């Protein structure tokens, strides 16, 4: 038996990302369309010139070969509500193309874009405040088209498997994930309260691609600091644990994942980020740290932090692509945990008779993006993230030996 379930993409087009829709009319293409009849779009009581503010409604129709069961796993068989917001007609063309090209791809799922009515949309602002996000966004490219869903298998999977269906810089955010991605095929725990999102970009120079994750990590730290400064809140001690983790008070609160494919002389890169914002489990979260630092509530909203991240990342990426990572190195070292850190490196001796212990001091990063360390005799060691097991808090690095 085949069942059909529906979820939605709502395309909201406005130069400020917000509108007061005063009427709904039927458009010529059968889609429901709402427009602003006033001369301004209202954003938190501030008027701004209206430039073609239009809302269009789309549905994603999901086909499944089996009806979901009544147990918990049934939630993994559905796509839930998906809403996309943008602020230019360019992104609308991509959504229109999805209709013609038979929708999006997801593992074990057929997704087809069809037209439905606005009544399928309920109070999605209770989950993610699109207007708050758009009002804080200041980028030219990244995050201008945002896809949101209360529940997805993985934001990373959605974008990576549909990379060319959306413009570069498209972002996808979910309230929860049940197949979140981590490094080396690890699963990332994705409870409610964790800020989970992915976005896309393209690069031509593969030699600097390993350094991109450091630019992303730096942007995460700077975004947290910017939001706290804006709120006049104390800044928590959040730092980068090499190569791609975000730590606070010795506990992991976030991580970065970058994957890429190569085609037509370009790398198609999908970047995923998970950050504990409101969930104190399994470790701690940013808002809990803020509450410990002050008696006044300065809670960070994920919409604000997401917009701040894209703002910082766009600036840092431009510097990285034009001037190289060396221009950002001092900033990066200021935010990581490892400058001058002394660790015990366990490796095999030259006769391969067994492990040999060498004390090394972390010096920084190599031009290839690997960890650079030296021993007491000034011998240099280049440590690869996928070839070593790092326990920096115990001061130990173990070589991953082939069995």
Predicted regions and their residues:
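Short, conserved beta-turn/loop elements at beta-strand boundaries and strand-helix junctions
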Residues: 365-370
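Nucleotide and nucleotide-moiety/phosphate-recognizing core
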Residues: 163-165, 187-304
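A short macromolecule-binding patch
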Residues: 378-391
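Glycine-centered tight beta-turn/hairpin loop motif at sheet-sheet or coil-to-beta transitions
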Residues: 251, 353-355, 376-378
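SH3/SH3-like beta-barrel fold
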Residues: 371-375
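Conserved, helical-rich catalytic subdomain that frames metal- and/or nucleotide-binding sites
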Residues: 293-358, 363, 392-403
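N-terminal lobe of the biotin/lipoate ligase/transferase fold
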Residues: 1-230, 396-403
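Conserved beta-strand residues within beta-sheet cores
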Residues: 175, 243, 250-255, 340-342, ...
């Amino acid at each position: 038996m085949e069942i059909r379930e529906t979820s939605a993409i709502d395309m909201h087009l406005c130069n400020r990302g917000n509108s007061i829709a005063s009427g709904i009319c039927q458009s010529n293409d059968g889609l429901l369309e709402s427009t602003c009849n006033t001369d301004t779009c209202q954003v938190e009581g501030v008027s701004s010139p209206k430039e073609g503010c239009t809302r269009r409604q789309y549905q994603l129709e999901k086909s499944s070969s089996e009806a979901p069961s009544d147990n918990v796993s049934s939630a993994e068989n559905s796509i839930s509500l998906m809403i996309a917001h943008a602020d230019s007609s360019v992104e609308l063309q991509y959504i229109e193309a999805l209709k013609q090209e038979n929708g999006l791809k997801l593992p074990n799922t057929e997704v087809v874009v069809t037209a439905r009515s606005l009544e399928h949309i309920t109070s999605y602002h209770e989950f993610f405040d699109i207007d708050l996000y758009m009002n804080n966004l200041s980028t030219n490219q990244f995050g201008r088209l945002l896809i949101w869903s209360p529940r997805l298998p993985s934001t990373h999977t959605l974008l990576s498997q549909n990379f060319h269906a959306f413009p570069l810089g498209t972002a996808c955010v979910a309230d929860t994930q049940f197949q979140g991605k981590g490094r080396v095929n690890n699963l990332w725990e994705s409870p409610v309260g964790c800020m989970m999102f992915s976005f896309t970009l393209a690069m031509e120079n593969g030699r600097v691609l390993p350094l991109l994750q450091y630019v992303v990590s730096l942007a995460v730290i700077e975004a947290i600091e910017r939001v706290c400064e804006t709120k006049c809140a104390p800044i928590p001690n959040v730092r980068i644990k090499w190569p791609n983790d975000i730590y606070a008070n010795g506990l992991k609160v976030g991580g970065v994942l970058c994957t890429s494919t190569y085609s037509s002389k370009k790398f198609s890169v999908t970047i995923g980020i998970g950050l504990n914002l409101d969930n104190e489990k399994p470790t701690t979260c940013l808002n809990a740290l803020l509450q410990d630092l002050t008696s006044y509530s300065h809670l960070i909203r994920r919409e604000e932090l997401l917009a701040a991240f894209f703002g910082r990342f766009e600036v840092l990426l431009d510097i990285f692509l034009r001037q190289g990572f060396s221009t950002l190195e001092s900033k990066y070292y200021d935010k990581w945990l490892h400058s001058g850190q002394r660790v015990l490196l366990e490796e095999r001796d030259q006769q391969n008779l067994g492990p040999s212990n060498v004390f090394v001091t972390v010096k920084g990063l190599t031009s290839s993006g690997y960890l650079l360390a030296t021993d007491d005799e000034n011998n240099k060691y280049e440590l690869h993230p996928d070839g070593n097991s790092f326990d920096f808090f115990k001061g130990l690095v173990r070589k991953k030996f082939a069995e």
